[in-house]
UniProtKB/Swiss-Prot annotation:
Function (record text): Involved in cell division and chromosome segregation.
UniProt protein name: Probable cell division protein WhiA
HAMAP family recorded: HTH_type_WhiA
PANTHER family: CELL DIVISION PROTEIN WHIA-RELATED
Keywords: Cell cycle, Cell division, DNA-binding
DNA-binding region: 275-308
Protein's gene: whiA
Protein family (similarity comment): Belongs to the WhiA family.
A GO biological process held by the record: cell division
Species per Swiss-Prot/TrEMBL record: Clavibacter michiganensis subsp. michiganensis (strain NCPPB 382)
Length: 326
């Protein structure tokens, strides 16, 4: 997904000066991209990331914020894993780090959602939470009918916490579960743009909005074409029906047709594809479209009355069976 890669690269380069904001982003990345593991009776913190740039950012923050040393290993693409991933692991001091980042509670139990201090922090810290979640497990699809900014979550509690964090940023997000996988999704185009800006993807949001506008212009053009096609089809059907009924009216009335009504009927049959307005211009002297329509209407009414009186098929008898397909 090119858009996802663009967003993640830009977010991985966002410069943050406040320690609390950096810590909020890092803790969320660790929560959404890995977890706690027991290795040789020691708690290890692991984070599986999809770009080397993000892996360097995480290792830098681990060292500068918590003074811990981390190892990195490359997981090559294979089988279900479509791309190379980078595993950042903290073994020495892993439990202390887990406590400091809020991944472990006071009773040494792994948290189920997000650390409380993250979801109740400042707006800048909440934005960092979303930035971290997207860097760890987010995707952005192209603008269109199925456009979405989506984050895969480690569980329902984490998903609900992320929805609440979005609300703090005035962005509407929804949690959903599909085949046991919990996700938080933003589908509204304006909301997606707002979240991208809040997270710090200023460059990508410009490209995304341009793509969105182009899609909307194309969609509007297609709707107009379809609208015009439908109008043309209806006009063609109306012309065919009118000509068929006028022909039948001429048959029913024969020589009894008043001259002014016969003239209007002849106009209709001579210029079959013309509109009523155009028929009026063809008349000599010219007539208004209402005058033409009125004469044709009276011609048909007179013919239908005679058909009823004499037990004959009316003017509808000549209508083509496949009229709707015209």
């Amino acid at each position: 997904m090119p858009l996802t890669s663009d967003v993640k690269e830009e977010l991985s380069r966002v410069e943050v000066s406040k320690t609390t904001v950096r810590a909020a982003e890092l803790a969320t990345i660790l929560r959404f991209s890995g977890g706690l593991h027991l290795i040789s009776n020691r708690i290890a913190v692991e984070s599986e990331l999809d770009t080397p740039l993000l892996a360097r950012r995480v290792r830098k923050d681990l060292a500068e914020l918590y003074g811990v040393r981390s190892d990195i290993s490359v997981i090559p693409a294979s089988g279900m894993r479509r791309a190379t991933h980078y595993l950042v692991r903290v073994m020495e001091g892993g439990e202390t780090l887990a406590r400091q980042t809020g991944l472990l509670d006071a009773r040494r139990r792994p948290i189920r959602g997000l650390p409380n201090r993250l979801t109740t922090g400042s707006r800048e810290e909440i934005a960092a939470v979303w930035r971290g979640a997207f860097l760890a497990a987010g995707t952005l699809t192209d603008p269109g009918r199925s456009a979405a900014l989506e984050v895969t979550c480690p569980g329902n509690e984490a998903a609900m916490a992320l929805v609440g964090a979005a609300g703090r940023l005035d962005v509407s997000a929804k949690a959903r579960e599909v085949r046991g996988v919990h996700r938080v999704v933003i589908r509204d185009g304006d909301a997606i743009g707002q979240m991208l800006r809040v997270m710090g993807a200023q460059g990508t949001v410009v490209n995304w909005e341009e793509m969105r506008q182009r899609r909307e212009v194309r969609a509007t053009a297609n709707r107009l074409v379809n609208f015009d096609d439908a109008n043309l089809r209806r006009s063609a059907q109306a012309a065919v029906a009118a000509c068929a009924r006028v022909e039948r009216a001429m048959e029913i009335l024969g020589p009894d047709i008043p001259e002014h009504l016969k003239y209007a009927g002849d106009l209709r049959l001579r210029f079959r594809d013309s509109s009523l307005d155009e028929l009026g211009h063809h008349a000599d002297p010219p007539m208004t479209k209402d005058a033409v329509a009125g004469r044709i209407r009276r011609l048909l009414a007179m013919a239908d009355k005679k058909a009823v009186d004499e037990g004959l098929p009316g003017t509808d008898a000549n209508l083509p069976a496949d009229l709707d397909d015209v």
